[in-house]
Amino acid sequence: MRKAVLVLLLFLLACAPAWSQDTEYAELIKKGMKALEADSLSKAETIFLQAIAVKPADKASAVLYQYVGQLRVRQERHKEALEAFNYALQLAPTSQEVLMDRASLNIQMGRESHALNDLCDLLTLNPEHAEALFFRAYIYAEQHLNAKARADYERLVILQPRNREARLGLALLCDKDRRPQEAMEHIDVLLRYWPDDATVYAVRGGMYQKRRNYELALRDMNRAIELEPENPDFYISRALLYKDFHKKALATADFRKAVDLGASAQECASMMLDAE
């Protein structure tokens, strides 16, 4: 984030004389940048707000509001960050960067309907915005609007054939839609691009498990653990697989290993009771 902040604020500084002969605005931006370089987030925020107060209605201040919002997100002050992004969009309602920032924050806050509004507005401005396509597809999938989710994922894969997250999302969506052949085709492409991606093996293992092809499922789960032996989620997945074909001792051992690696002891204990 810091690099992007500095680049855009340097742009503001370069343009400031054209906006106003008053140098106070530019001086405050310089001070804010120095505070940011020193990682003094609260101080930087205070100074940027002082700069905004000098020129509150200027479109340039939309950028400052945006970065105040980003600083607040870093401090987990989400409601205040949302307020800053709202002010930024009042000054620059078609800013793609701020729309994306606000959409991302709304997703973090569990406000998917608000995020969806911003993503749709952003994609109206720029139909090929990759990040917006991905997050809108994700929200559509969560809302069980699978046709809309598929359209966004497919558009994104056309734009970025090596977009791992989009292909993975499309594979999972196809599997959910009971289109197993298409799901496996997307998995094959993923493994062609990323042959050592543990997550892809785990996902394919889960697909085989749903089809009760336990031998292939176990092969993929083992491969995922071989590639990422410190990932507790993979041990939980393999434990659940062992449960399916009544290997209770092996399932219990994997649950315990997952706890050792940081998984929730309470959740794993509940699953272990079912396995014993």
Task: Tell where the protein language model's regions lie, with residue ranges.
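Structural signature of tandem alpha-helical TPR/SEL1-like repeats
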Residues: S40-T46, Q75-Y87, M109-D121, Q143-R155, ...
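Terminal, low-structured helical/coil segments at or just beyond the last alpha-helical repeat
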Residues: L240, D244-E276
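N-terminal leader/linker segments that initiate helical-solenoid repeat arrays
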Residues: A18-Y67, R74, E276
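Canonical tetratricopeptide repeat
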Residues: V63-Y67, D101, F135, G169, ...
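Short coil turns that delineate tetratricopeptide repeat
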Residues: P56-K59, P93, P127, P161, ...
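A conserved position within tetratricopeptide repeats
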Residues: I52-P56, L89, L123, V157, ...
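Helix-start (N-cap) detector for alpha-helical repeat units in TPR-like alpha-solenoids
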Residues: Y25-A26, K59-A62, Q96-E97, A130-E131, ...
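Position-specific recognition of the canonical hydrophobic site in helix A of tetratricopeptide repeat
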Residues: L36, Q66, V73, M100, ...
